[in-house]
């Protein structure tokens, strides 16, 4: 019996609907995201529900005949006729959409979007992963008519929707807006639910496995398969295996609590700066990781003064991060599962909490920046985990994996840059609490920042 594909509600669907209604064929959209993040499922569901008919061309398995159609697009009438015959679908003017799935496999189709959009008969949606990798774009003209949308792993609210819960996150939001505590018992329950999300993650296949089996060992198998797929992709891009090594080392590098990702400690010395920049840029383009850059001058223009050679790397999905951290061990030996499932909070899990906060901020469209500066004696560094712009101010965020409320780095930073500082946040595991200028938020409320 064929397995039924579970389709999860995604927030990007509403943005796509706005595009369809507002642009009326003037642009195409490119839905970009990591492999296995749910791009194809989302766009096909959108096409099925919002159009009279659609043609989906999956370039990862298209025939030579279909691939060849895009080598000469001088006669669009002929192109549309051939597509309708090959896919046995009737296209209706301004009521049908053509989907170019895995468009990076046929760059000429992506280049053709300019002329297809100008023709105006149909809508066009592209999906792609590794879309910006040099080998996928080096010989084509990128169409300016292409609007990019990014699909990330399910965020926490989407995860709750998948579990059939539409009430919790709106209630959390109203509590956050009123800045009132929820009470210890409720906080413990909300935190336990959020820690489940940290373990399962937001990859649709992992969420499906959890819903089907209620078994984290089965979920872990699915996550291992996704990690293997990513590593295979990295080896195709970089035959030396260095990119795969950089990805595998993300948890261990974060766990060192160093002020940056130390590339040389992972792949050894003797690698040129240009090679390192290319490897990290292409890994970032794959959307399997989130990169936080050091802000050399913490203020509103952080993207202008970021240090591209000083950064931290987070896994784009915290569920994958948990599995990656113990990739060489059996599921039963992965202590992160045991510690997060129990109510015993462990200060040593700071790197897991930091990763899920990075994932949450990126899902909300934020760029990641952090800041370090030397102590008065100069023997170690103060560090602000994340910085968010807020109007003409900057908001420092410190992440704690426990109920620990001390935050020396935050205090010194706010004193040093008092004129630039807006809201100050400590994300931790206890209830919402305001003390002086600092707002203590339970980690599950990071989604509202």
Q: Language-model segments: which ranges?
A:
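Structural recognition of the conserved hydrophobic beta-strand(s) that form the central parallel beta-sheet
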Residues: 99, 123-129, 150
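Hydrophobic anchor at the beta1->P-loop junction of P-loop NTPases
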Residues: 31
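Conserved lysine of the Walker
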Residues: 39
């Amino acid at each position: 019996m064929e397995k039924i594909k579970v389709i999860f509600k995604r927030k990007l669907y509403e943005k796509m609907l706005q595009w369809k209604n507002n642009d009326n064929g003037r642009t195409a959209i490119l839905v970009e995201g990591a492999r296995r993040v749910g791009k194809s499922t989302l766009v096909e569901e959108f096409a099925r529900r919002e159009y009279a008919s659609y043609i989906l061309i999956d370039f990862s398995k298209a025939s030579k005949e279909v691939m060849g159609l895009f080598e000469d697009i001088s006669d669009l009438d002929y192109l549309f006729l051939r597509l309708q015959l090959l896919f046995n679908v009737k296209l209706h003017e301004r009521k049908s959409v053509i989907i170019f799935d895995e468009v990076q496999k046929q760059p000429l189709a992506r280049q053709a979007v300019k002329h297809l959009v100008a023709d105006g008969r149909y809508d066009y949606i592209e999906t792609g992963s590794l879309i910006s990798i040099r080998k996928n774009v080096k010989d084509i003209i990128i169409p300016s008519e292409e609007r990019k949308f990014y699909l990330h792993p399910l965020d926490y609210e989407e995860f709750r929707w998948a579990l059939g819960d539409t009430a919790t996150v709106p209630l959390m939001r109203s509590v956050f807006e009123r800045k009132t505590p929820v009470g210890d018992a409720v906080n413990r329950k909300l935190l336990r639910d959020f820690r489940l999300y940290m373990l399962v993650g937001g990859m649709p296949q992992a969420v499906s496995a959890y819903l089907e089996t209620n078994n984290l060992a089965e979920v872990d198998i699915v996550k291992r398969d996704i990690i293997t797929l990513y590593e295979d992709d990295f080896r195709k891009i970089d035959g030396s295996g260095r990119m795969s090594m950089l990805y595998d080392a993300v948890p261990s590098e974060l766990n060192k609590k160093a002020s940056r990702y130390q590339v040389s400690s992972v792949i050894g010395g003797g690698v040129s700066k240009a090679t390192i920049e290319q490897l990290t840029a292409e890994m970032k383009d794959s959307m399997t990781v989130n990169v936080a850059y050091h802000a050399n001058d913490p203020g509103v223009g952080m993207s202008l003064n970021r240090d591209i050679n000083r950064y931290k790397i987070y896994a784009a999905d915290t569920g994958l991060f948990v599995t990656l951290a113990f990739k060489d061990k059996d599921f039963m030996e992965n202590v992160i599962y045991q510690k997060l499932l129990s109510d015993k909070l462990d200060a040593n899990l700071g790197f897991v909490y930091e990763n899920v906060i990075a994932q949450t901020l990126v899902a909300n469209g934020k760029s990641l920046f952090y800041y370090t500066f030397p102590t008065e004696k100069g023997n170690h560094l103060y560090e602000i985990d994340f910085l968010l712009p807020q109007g003409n101010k900057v908001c420092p965020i410190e992440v704690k994996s426990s109920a620990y409320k001390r935050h020396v780095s935050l205090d010194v930073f706010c004193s040093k840059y008092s004129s630039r500082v807006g809201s100050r946040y400590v994300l931790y595991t206890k209830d919402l609490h305001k003390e002086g200028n600092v707002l203590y938020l339970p980690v599950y409320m990071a989604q509202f920042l």
